[in-house]
C-alpha cells in the first residue's frame, strides 16, 4: 500500500504540468518541449520552421528542414530548471543534430537528411527511508525519469518541401527502492517508444514572389514568406509497469497538428544578405489518444478528437484538446522575441515568452563593412545562440510558492560545409 500511495503522489506532482483527467498515463513529461526557443513560443514545435538544435523533438520531420541549413548543431541547458511543486523537482535537457543538403553538391538531388539526439531527465529530489526504531537512514535514493531519443529525418523538394521523420525513444524510470528479505531492490522500469512526423512547407516567396525586388537608398530588399503544415504522433509503445503487469499504465500517446505562417524581408548590404525582419504565427493543437474506462485502456485513431476547423482555424480548446498559439519576431538575425499561450484539457491558461540572442546578424553586419578573411570564415560557418524562456503556470494558483518556470539554453551551429 505504501508503494501505491507513493506512486500516486509522484504522479500528481509531475502532472502539475498538464491535466490528464481524461486518462491515466505514465511519464507525462514525455510530452514537454525540450527546445527553449519553442518553449517560449507556446510550447509549439509541430509545424514551426525551426533550425534550433532540439527543435525536432515534437516532430522529427523537422530534421529534413533544418538539414538545409545545419551541418551540425548542439544545444544544452547550462543549469537545471526548478519546477515549482511540493518537492524539489528539477529537469534538464541537451542534444544535437547533424545533417546534409545534397542539393548543394548536385542540383539534381533535392534531398536533405538529418539525424538527431536528445537526452532529458526529471528528478524528484532525495528521499530517505528510516527504520521504525531509529531515525537513522536505511536507504537514500532519488527517483528519476529519463530518456534518450534518436531521430532520423529527410526532406525532398518538388515545388514544395516534403519532410518525414522517425524517432526511437529509450526510457528509464526509477520510482522507489524496496527493502526485501533478499536486500534492497529497485522499483524501476525500462522501455522504448517511437514518434512519427510529417512536415510540408510551401515556399510562397520562391513560387510567386521570387522576382519581387525593392531598391531603397541603394539597398536591395526582397520579401520572404512560407506556409507550413505539420503532423506528429508521439510515444507509441507498450504499457509500463513497476511491480505488477496487471497494474500497468500506458505511455502518453499524443497526436499533434499545426501550421505556421511566416513572412519577412531580406536585405542585401554589399555582398552580404541579411534577414532584416521576420515574423511568424503558429497555431497547434494536440490530443492525448489514451482513454481508460471500465473495460480497460483504449486508443483513439491517429487524429484523436482533433477538428481542424475548430482547434486550428478558430483556435478553440476544449476538455480533450490543448491549443497552442505563438507569435515570434526576429530582427537582423540577432534578437528574437516569442510569446504564446497554451490552454485546454481542463487546466488554466499557460503564458509563455522568451528572448534569443544570436551572433549571426551581428557578424554579418561586421562582414558587410570590414574586409577580414578570418571574420568572413567564422561568420559563414559558426553561430552561437543564447535563449531564455519563461512559462507561467496557473494550475495550482496560490498553492505553490511560484508558478513561473525559467529555462535557459546555449547552442552552437556549424553550417555551409560541403563535404
Language-model segments: residues:
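Bacterial Sec-dependent N-terminal signal peptides
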Residues: 1-26, 327
Amino acid at each position: 500500500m505504501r508503494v501505491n500511495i507513493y506512486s500516486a503522489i509522484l504522479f500528481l506532482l509531475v502532472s502539475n504540468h498538464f491535466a490528464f483527467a481524461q486518462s491515466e498515463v505514465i511519464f507525462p513529461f514525455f510530452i514537454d518541449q525540450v527546445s527553449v526557443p519553442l518553449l517560449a513560443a507556446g510550447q509549439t514545435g509541430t509545424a514551426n520552421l525551426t533550425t534550433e538544435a532540439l527543435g525536432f523533438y515534437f516532430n522529427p520531420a523537422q530534421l529534413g528542414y533544418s538539414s538545409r541549413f545545419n551541418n551540425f548543431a548542439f544545444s544544452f541547458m547550462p543549469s537545471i530548471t526548478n519546477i515549482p511543486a511540493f518537492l524539489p523537482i528539477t529537469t534538464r535537457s541537451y542534444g544535437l543534430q547533424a545533417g546534409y543538403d545534397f542539393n548543394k553538391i548536385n542540383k539534381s538531388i533535392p534531398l536533405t537528411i538529418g539525424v538527431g539526439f536528445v537526452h532529458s531527465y526529471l528528478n524528484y529530489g532525495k528521499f530517505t527511508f528510516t527504520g521504525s526504531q531509529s531515525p537513522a537512514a536505511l536507504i537514500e535514493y532519488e527517483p528519476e525519469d529519463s530518456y534518450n531519443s534518436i531521430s532520423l529525418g529527410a526532406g525532398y523538394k518538388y515545388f514544395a518541401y516534403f519532410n518525414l521523420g522517425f524517432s526511437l525513444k529509450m526510457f528509464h524510470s526509477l520510482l522507489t527502492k524496496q527493502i526485501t528479505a533478499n536486500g534492497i531492490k529497485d522499483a524501476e522500469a525500462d522501455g522504448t517508444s517511437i514518434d512519427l512526423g510529417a512536415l510540408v512547407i510551401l515556399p510562397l516567396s520562391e513560387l510567386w514572389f521570387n522576382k519581387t525586388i525593392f531598391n531603397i537608398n541603394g539597398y536591395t530588399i526582397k520579401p520572404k514568406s512560407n506556409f507550413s503544415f505539420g503532423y506528429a504522433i508521439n510515444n507509441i509503445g507498450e504499457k509500463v509497469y513497476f511491480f505488477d503487469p496487471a497494474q500497468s499504465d500506458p505511455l502518453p500517446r499524443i497526436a499533434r497538428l499545426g501550421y505556421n505562417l511566416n513572412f519577412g524581408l531580406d536585405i542585401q548590404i554589399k555582398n552580404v544578405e541579411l534577414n532584416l525582419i521576420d515574423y511568424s504565427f503558429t497555431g497547434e493543437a494536440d490530443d492525448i489518444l489514451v482513454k481508460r474506462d471500465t473495460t480497460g485502456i483504449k486508443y483513439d485513431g491517429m487524429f484523436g478528437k482533433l477538428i481542424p476547423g475548430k482547434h486550428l482555424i478558430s483556435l478553440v480548446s476544449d476538455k480533450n484538446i490543448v491549443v497552442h498559439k505563438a507569435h515570434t519576431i526576429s530582427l537582423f538575425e540577432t534578437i528574437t522575441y516569442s510569446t504564446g499561450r497554451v490552454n485546454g484539457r481542463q487546466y488554466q491558461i499557460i503564458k509563455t515568452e522568451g528572448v534569443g540572442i544570436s551572433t549571426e546578424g551581428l557578424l554579418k553586419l561586421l562582414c558587410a563593412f570590414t574586409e577580414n578573411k578570418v571574420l568572413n570564415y567564422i561568420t559563414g560557418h559558426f553561430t552561437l545562440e543564447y535563449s531564455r524562456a519563461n512559462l507561467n503556470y496557473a494550475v495550482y494558483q496560490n498553492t505553490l510558492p511560484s508558478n513561473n518556470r525559467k529555462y535557459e539554453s546555449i547552442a552552437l551551429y556549424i553550417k555551409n560545409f560541403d563535404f
